[in-house]
Amino acid sequence: MSHRLPPPLQPGDRVYAIAPSGCLRSQLIRGRSELDAYRQGVEIWRQRGYCVEIDPDCEAQWGYLAGTDAQRRQQLDRAWQDPGIKAILCARGGYGASRLLEDWVRPQTDSPPKWLVGFSDITALLWSIYNEGIAGVHAPVLTSLSAEPDWSVRRLFDWVEGRTIPPLQGRGWGGGTVCGTLLPGNLTVATALLGTKVQPDLEGAILAFEDVGEAPYRIDRLLTQWR
């Protein structure tokens, strides 16, 4: 299956913030609250010239989730159905996106595909649209954007605005050269999606996993599941 990139963004475009996973917490983490970090992330997009609109339920809370499943599905629907919205910005990861996919079908519209921006738990949504031939961007959520180094923020905006970006940094353990479709994802979330309808066709895919705060034995267990 070939995958379409959404049209490049331009300053002045409308972008929409949603919280499809965990709720925004007010307690301090490393000296600041997630709410503060989220608002700083919104401000970075606004400083780039984008019209950031925030879903009315974006700061909702239902236990550890950002509202009930129905509320969070409605956030997704509002974002996808508005033809003027060019990108969907996820507020944070955590947990909860995969719950939405049990009873949610992306609204079909005549407009071009939108950018879906996020990582961590947002992997479930990114892989869901990947199955429809739409490429998203595995990138910082709003709560983490302001903590990113300048080069990382530049790379995000260069990519969604249609500019060429330099090759990925780092070196693989196994060596060699491969060619395929790059499919990033959170290791824990991606492993949970194995064997479900959301699991993409992995033939020819180059998997790029991320995770944080997991003990080595848990990483070992998760990777073993992929053998």
For the regions a protein language model found, what residue spans apply to each?
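Internal helical hairpin/lid segments
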Residues: D201-R227
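Short, acidic/small-residue loops that bind anionic groups at enzyme active sites
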Residues: W104-I129, A135-L142
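Conserved anion/nucleotide-ligand pocket segment
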Residues: I134-G195
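N-terminal glycine-rich "phosphate-gripper" loop used for MgATP/nucleotide binding
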Residues: I88-S98, F119
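Short glycine-rich anion-binding loops that position phosphate/pyrophosphate groups of nucleotides
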Residues: C23, R92-Y95, E214
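ATP/NTP phosphate-donor binding region
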Residues: M1-G84
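Structural motif
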Residues: A87-L89, V117, I206-A208
